[in-house]
Amino acid sequence: MTQQLQTLIDNAWDNRASLSPSAAPKEVVDAVEHVIAELNNGRLRVATREGVGQWTVHQWIKKAVLLSFRLKDNELMKAGDLGFFDKVPTKFAHLSADEMAATGVRVVPPAVARRGSFIAKGAILMPSYVNIGAYVDEGTMVDTWATVGSCAQVGKNVHLSGGVGLGGVLEPLQANPTIIEDNCFIGARSEVVEGVIVEENSVISMGVYIGQSTPIYDRTTGEITYGRVPAGSVVVSGNLPKDGGRYSMYAAIIVKKVDAKTRSTTSLNDLLRD
């Protein structure tokens, strides 16, 4: 079934220029809708973890997310007195109180999660935004004004502090999703984008910006890497000298490995998760 679905989506993607809400084969519409529904329920995800820092990205699922925009017209959506005009409904709009309780998720107004995202049991959405295709795992808090971009993958027991931004894949078009692994703490107003992977148990200080072109400098080893924060790292914003010291350029600095002191200042509060 999955292979047939993948083949159908791949073929539709190759012929996407010919698709529209009024001109698309029913089998393509049904296939795309099936993928979105499975993403919404957490049975499919854009990327799956094989090990620490090792992920397999399912490009065909990302293609289905993009095709869903091609196949739908905007429509009027209401939330109380507020009106919206969009192609993607919100995730929780039509759930009853019992259905919401069964999800095990706490959603603080005016948090928004789009249909096609998955929010696991024990997660908390403060007034924040979770885009289509994103996956937020158990026990994670998405704090106020944080944004989980399209198809971003967030692990278990992660804290995304206020104003954090995780980049999406839809625009500008990115090959791989941004990934935050289990037990990470992302400090306020930090941005992780362009498919960067933050490996498990890492702490990103507030105001750190990491993209694929950002040098990640380990002050202990002197090594510079790109696109990946090693497991258990504590990262702050900084600069590296360039051109013989004539000027410096921004870098993310690994200052140490996570220790007991770090854990004591970034631990999750179980009282908030009752």
UniProtKB/Swiss-Prot annotation:
Alphabetically ordered keywords of this record: Acyltransferase, Amino-acid biosynthesis, Cytoplasm, Diaminopimelate biosynthesis, Lysine biosynthesis, Repeat, Transferase
EC number: 2.3.1.117
Binding site for substrate: R106, D143
Main location: cytoplasm
Associated pathway: Amino-acid biosynthesis; L-lysine biosynthesis via DAP pathway; LL-2,6-diaminopimelate from (S)-tetrahydrodipicolinate (succinylase route): step 1/3
Cellular location(s): Cytoplasm
Coiled-coil regions listed: none
MF terms (GO), sorted A to Z: 2,3,4,5-tetrahydropyridine-2,6-dicarboxylate N-succinyltransferase activity; nucleotidyltransferase activity
Gene Ontology annotations of biological process type: diaminopimelate biosynthetic process; lysine biosynthetic process via diaminopimelate
Catalytic reaction annotation: (S)-2,3,4,5-tetrahydrodipicolinate + succinyl-CoA + H2O = (S)-2-succinylamino-6-oxoheptanedioate + CoA
A GO cellular component annotation in the UniProt record: cytoplasm
UniProt cross-references to NCBIfam families, sorted A to Z: dapD, PRK11830.1
Quaternary structure note: Homotrimer.
Family the entry assigns: Belongs to the transferase hexapeptide repeat family.
Name of this protein: 2,3,4,5-tetrahydropyridine-2,6-dicarboxylate N-succinyltransferase
Species whose genome carries this gene: Acidovorax sp. (strain JS42)
Gene encoding the protein: dapD
